[in-house]
From Swiss-Prot:
Lineage: Bacteria, Pseudomonadati, Pseudomonadota, Gammaproteobacteria, Enterobacterales
Species for this entry: Blochmanniella floridana
Full protein name: UDP-N-acetylmuramate--L-alanine ligase
Listed SUPFAM superfamilies: MurCD N-terminal domain (SSF51984), MurD-like peptide ligases, catalytic domain (SSF53623), MurD-like peptide ligases, peptide-binding domain (SSF53244)
Protein origin, superkingdom: Bacteria
Record-linked InterPro entries: Mur-like_cat_sf, Mur_ligase_C, Mur_ligase_C_dom_sf, Mur_ligase_cen, Mur_ligase_N, MurCDEF_pg_biosynth, UDP-N-AcMur_Ala_ligase_MurC
Length: 480
């Protein structure tokens, strides 16, 4: 099936005469889905494999891409010219091994992303948290301005219906990946740094100073005519500012920011705030996305848009029309309790991808600010043994701030278990730390039973995590 996003184009690192079919191992991954869409749009035959369905997989299936479920050497044949992997794919993956036996080149996804960006005006969004939403907001502005950008995002932008699209315009907006240092291979003109926090520390040899050095190196790669947009509220970003040798635009709630957020107010999911710009201009922003963290994401995208000459009216219209990103504080609906436990009333369900303590904290604060009259019930699935181990105490503190906590076992994401690090031990630590009494749901089949007993009218049910948690809980509500 030919993609409706087809544009005449050629990826320079792939010879179109010899290359017809490209296979993605782990095609449903955050960084893989979008690239598959872009290459499909350029006329390549795309296939892929993954272990389970998710929103990304479903969007690819709608485009006619053939996807195998499960990783097997039989998925790879000699008709495939290139196999694409990410850092999440083990070298011993049967498809990778079969490709090597058949002498099929195996390349990392970032090689394709960097080559695509090299031929356009690249805008790379980097940082530990907030990248996906910032890409979504900035893309929304560019589309509203009629600039038809190419974009690659880590989540489906609801207003666009996809996570990536090949545009006719000159601009390329991309989410970059610091988890494996692959963002150092990108060649943007503009770089946004939302924050720098402890995550993926195995990549950085458990050395936070090294992580900071890599971010500085990323900014040093900007051309002399390029610029960096950075969040000055973040203490680590503020610390490295003197070492950035490019034009800098700062944003945040801090009074010394180039774009300063003031008069922030939130009611339910809507937030209002003013952005003061150092040339004495003011922008009154209305955003249909809650949370201080999303005001910061909006300020980052607004900073780029202003610098690129996009009109204020376009920016503000785009902000007020912004409908969000899948699994980023996604409002799934108000569901009658009788579909779960036969009781009278409704429960509001929100789905969120956040899996780092800082992200959980931001989401909880947004809920407490906008829905202080609701009981907060969280179903949380920890993501990765290494992250849970490295940030254990932070998880204990932030998870202790909800009213009711149900915890599934850790989603490994392919990692080997770490002795003593599991959901049960995390629940035990939370119980010792706070009044909340966490419930460890050892088998996801029992989740419905627990929810039947716990949920009551006006509860806010928060589905939290980056693993399979969203699919599990959606099945309880949406498919019933």
């Amino acid at each position: 099936m030919q993609s409706s996003y087809f544009k005449n184009g050629i990826l320079p690192i792939i010879n179109r005469f010899y290359t017809k079919q490209i296979h993605f191992v782990g095609i449903g991954g955050i960084g893989m889905c979008g690239l598959a869409m872009l290459l499909l749009a350029q006329g390549y035959c795309i296939t892929g494999s993954d272990i389970a369905q998710n929103d990304m997989i479903r969007s690819l299936l709608k485009l006619g891409i053939k996807i195998f479920f499960g990783h097997r050497d039989s998925n790879i044949n000699q008709e495939i010219n290139i196999v694409v992997i990410s850092s999440a794919i083990d070298i011993n993956n049967p498809e990778v091994q079969q490709a090597k036996r058949l002498k099929i080149p195996v390349i990392h996804r970032v090689k394709i992303l960097s080559e695509l960006m090299r031929y356009k005006y690249g805008i790379a969004i980097a940082g530990t948290h907030g990248k996906t939403t910032t890409v979504s907001m900035l893309t929304n502005i560019y589309v509203e301005a009629g600039l038809d950008p190419t974009f690659v995002n880590g989540g489906i932008i609801r207003s666009q219906g996809v996570s990536a699209r090949l545009g006719y315009g000159n601009d390329f907006i991309a989410e970059s990946d610091e988890s494996d240092k692959s963002f150092l291979r990108l060649c943007p003109v503009v770089a946004v740094i939302t924050n720098i926090d402890t995550d993926h520390m195995n990549t950085y040899h458990q050395n936070f100073e090294y992580l900071q050095e890599v971010f500085i190196k990323f900014l040093d790669k900007l051309p002399m005519y390029g610029y960096a947009v950075v969040c000055i509220d973040d203490p680590v970003v503020r610390k490295i500012l003197p070492r950035i040798n490019r034009k800098i635009i700062t944003y945040g709630f801090s009074k010394d920011a180039t774009l300063c957020i003031v008069k922030y107010y939130q009611y339910r999911e809507k937030s209002n705030f003013t952005i003061l710009i150092k040339n004495n201009k003011e922008l009154q922003v209305v955003l249909n996305t809650p949370g201080y963290h999303n005001a910061l994401n909006a300020a980052a995208s607004i900073a780029v848009a202003i610098e690129e000459g996009i009109r204020d009216t376009v920016i503000l219209k785009s902000m007020s029309n912004f409908t969000g990103t899948n699994r980023r504080f996604e409002f799934l609906g108000n569901y009658p309790l009788n579909i779960i436990n036969g009781r009278v009333g409704k429960v509001m369900v929100i789905d969120d991808y956040g899996h780092h303590p800082a992200e959980l904290r931001s989401t909880i604060i947004a809920i407490r600010t906008g829905w202080s009259d609701h009981r907060l019930v969280m179903v949380f699935q920890p993501h990765r043994f290494t992250r849970t181990h490295e940030l254990y105490d932070n998880f204990v503190r932030v998870l202790s701030t909800v009213d009711v906590l149900l915890m599934l076992d850790i989603y490994s994401a392919g990692e080997q278990p770490i002795m003593g690090i599991n959901a049960q031990s995390l629940c035990d630590s939370i119980l010792k730390y706070a009044k909340v009494q966490p419930i460890f749901v050892q088998n996801e089949c029992f989740l419905l039973k627990f929810l039947m007993n716990l949920l009551r009218d006006k509860d806010l049910l928060l589905i939290q995590g980056a693993g399979t948690i969203s699919e599990i809980v959606k099945a309880l509500f949406i498919k019933r």
